[in-house]
From Swiss-Prot:
GO terms for cellular component: cytosol. This is Phosphoribosylaminoimidazole-succinocarboxamide synthase. It catalyses: 5-amino-1-(5-phospho-D-ribosyl)imidazole-4-carboxylate + L-aspartate + ATP = (2S)-2-[5-amino-1-(5-phospho-beta-D-ribosyl)imidazole-4-carboxamido]succinate + ADP + phosphate + 2 H(+). PROSITE patterns: SAICAR_SYNTHETASE_1, SAICAR_SYNTHETASE_2. Its EC number is 6.3.2.6. GO terms for biological process: 'de novo' IMP biosynthetic process; cobalamin biosynthetic process. Pathway: Purine metabolism; IMP biosynthesis via de novo pathway; 5-amino-1-(5-phospho-D-ribosyl)imidazole-4-carboxamide from 5-amino-1-(5-phospho-D-ribosyl)imidazole-4-carboxylate: step 1/2. One of its GO terms (molecular function) is phosphoribosylaminoimidazolesuccinocarboxamide synthase activity. Keywords: ATP-binding, Ligase, Nucleotide-binding, Purine biosynthesis. The keyword ATP-binding applies. It comes from the Bacteria. Pfam families: SAICAR_synt. Belongs to the SAICAR synthetase family. It comes from Yersinia enterocolitica serotype O:8 / biotype 1B (strain NCTC 13174 / 8081).
Amino acid sequence: MQKLAELYRGKAKTVYTTENPDLLVLEFRNDTSALDGQRIEQFDRKGMVNNKFNHFIMAKLEEAGIPTQMESLLSDTEVLVKKLEMIPVECVIRNRAAGSLVKRLGIEEGLELNPPLFDLFLKNDAMHDPMVNESYCKTFGWATEAQLARMKELSYLANDVLSKLFDDAGLILVDFKLEFGLFNGEVVLGDEFSPDGSRLWDKKTLNKMDKDRYRQSLGGLIEAYEEVAHRIGVKLD
């Protein structure tokens, strides 16, 4: 499948059209960003690692009955995906307290959350992705009640599948974000799942193995991503 025109360039990925109006090419770049895109650096191999990581995770979620946009792996940095009508809201599942939750509530980082929390955020970098709720989504027309219910159901199902996958690999799935869209009217998982959009800690040491290594200037970003990929069985080379 040949990529044609650039459709959209995000902070770490570029989307291209193809000759099929229902399919797009998603290219993972080496860019890494923080502070809503205000800080950006390039890391060798990052695009390749995240692309193969994401393809692996999406396949696992498909096996569990979660519909995804994934079609096929095209190259080290590219995948073929369905063209979705994206819902402009991020779904976040939190198994442990970290990030904005700690700042907002003043609770201890690492606190186990049982049952896991489900949060919604409006996708808007200029507004720093404000937290919203289901009432906002319905009032402003971002998603219907049925779509929200399905997004929540699929997010918790993904959490069940991925928490076990990472736990078996000696890792804690602290939290993660998912984005959904519509394909022929069906709610489908889009965007990506990688250490860019999740928090993963080593079970024994609690070392951070995700983009917090970049956000907090801990170093060893790609080494951590590759270690996580290796532990869960992603073939990188």
